Swiss-Prot record:
Annotated InterPro entries: Aldolase_TIM (IPR013785), His_biosynth (IPR006062), HisF (IPR004651), IGPS_HisA/HisF (IPR050064), RibuloseP-bd_barrel (IPR011060)
Compartment(s): Cytoplasm
Residues at the active site: D11, D130
Enzyme class: lyase
Entry-linked PANTHER family: IMIDAZOLE GLYCEROL PHOSPHATE SYNTHASE HISHF, IMIDAZOLE GLYCEROL PHOSPHATE SYNTHASE SUBUNIT HISF/H IGP SYNTHASE SUBUNIT HISF/H
Annotated family: Belongs to the HisA/HisF family.
Keywords: Amino-acid biosynthesis, Cytoplasm, Histidine biosynthesis, Lyase
One Pfam family, short name: His_biosynth
Gene name tied to this protein: hisF
Any one of the GO BP annotations: L-histidine biosynthetic process
Pathway(s) it belongs to: Amino-acid biosynthesis; L-histidine biosynthesis; L-histidine from 5-phospho-alpha-D-ribose 1-diphosphate: step 5/9
UniProt protein name: Imidazole glycerol phosphate synthase subunit HisF
Iron-sulfur among keywords: no
Range of residues in the leader sequence: none
Length: 258
């Protein structure tokens, strides 16, 4: 069995790490490189960086910090933000990123997933899915351009359908960003994760809602996700990654202990 992964997420805007609640009202957390270094030293398995306004601004991720991160950490990291072409992806990978993640650009042009996978291999192509639960309809819908609340829109895709579509097109991994849970720290949406897990045959990463060590355990044990991504609990030092991994190991979770 592959070890489960603990993945800190760093949302980047204007060269700094920020964090919002339900993708809104972002506050500045700190500088990118020192945070990345700290998480690597604490025992993170990999890092994910989202340039959250790149797609909505119509630009690609700011590449200047990518190479600086690569210089100070020795764990894999993934970069997302406005990657709309093979050239965009090639540049980011050449600066040291191990994976690239696409979200809104994939919704605008689903063939991008296949072209990236064919060029760089499925192992480094991640598709991020921003999913919102509609309490009135009881359905999960995919959202686009979520980095800018003035441009965020609900797409025609239901989440389970889009999960299956991106796999057909070559996604090597899926990060499910559960917007309702984002930043509120009351647990991952286990019901949604279980439904997605049934149709997801590539590595699945849970994102949105972690507030306690037990929340990570529930995602691994009850929804069988491959990785758990979190931001605010790590940024605010509510949970230490090393202590989290030690706890998970005592609960029988296969995890890499540093």
């Amino acid at each position: 069995m592959l070890a489960k992964r603990i993945i800190p997420c760093l949302d980047v805007r204007d060269g700094q790490v920020v964090k919002g609640v339900q993708f809104r009202n972002h506050e500045i957390i700190g500088d990118i490189v020192p945070l990345a270094k700290r998480y690597a030293e604490e025992g993170a398995d990999e890092l994910v960086f989202y340039d959250i306004t790149a797609s909505s601004d119509g630009r690609v991720v700011d590449k200047s910090w990518v190479s600086r991160v690569a210089e100070v950490i020795d764990i894999p990291f993934c970069v997302a933000g406005g990657i709309k072409s093979l050239d965009d992806a090639a540049k980011i990978l050449s600066f040291g990123a191990d994976k690239i993640s696409i979200n809104s650009p994939a919704l605008a042009d689903p063939t991008l997933i296949t072209r990236l996978a064919d060029r760089f291999g499925v192992q480094c192509i991640v598709v991020g899915i921003d999913t919102w639960y509609d309490g009135e309809t009881g359905k999960y819908h995919v959202n686009q351009y979520t980095g800018d609340e003035s441009r965020t829109r609900v797409t025609q895709w239901e989440t389970l359908d889009w999960v299956q579509e991106v796999q057909k097109r070559g996604a090597g991994e899926i990060v499910l960003n559960m917007m309702n849970q984002d930043g509120v720290r009351n647990g991952y949406d286990l019901e949604q994760l279980k439904k997605v897990r049934e149709v997801c045959h590539v590595p699945l990463i849970a994102s949105g809602g972690a507030g306690t060590m037990e929340h990570f355990l529930e995602a691994f044990r009850d929804a069988d996700v491959d990785g758990a991504l979190a931001a605010s609990v790590f940024h605010k030092q509510i949970i230490n990654i090393g202590e989290l991994k030690a706890y998970l190991a005592t609960q029988g979770v296969e995890i890499r202990i540093c």
